[in-house]
């Protein structure tokens, strides 16, 4: 049985733009439109390039929400949720699912020594 890939085509790990006072949500939405107009099939919001480790929980949720809204179903959205705090990672993953993200990007906790 052949499987259909979840993601196909180019995928861009987008930046999270900032002004002097915080996240520049208008520029973020313009960036999503630019990606769509140039044939991008999927975007990663809040990955390492998107400042995942430095965003507050509120900023993270708002960035993911706005990217999903701006994509309007025309592109897949992958939400970066990785980090060292397991509870936060799980909460961000659930939030991304609830908001309609097509996938999540997780990493192994860094700086923590694993038992395996």
What is each of the regions a protein language model found here?
Residues 2-12, 16-116:
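Active-site beta->alpha loop and helix N-cap motifs at the rims of alpha/beta catalytic domains
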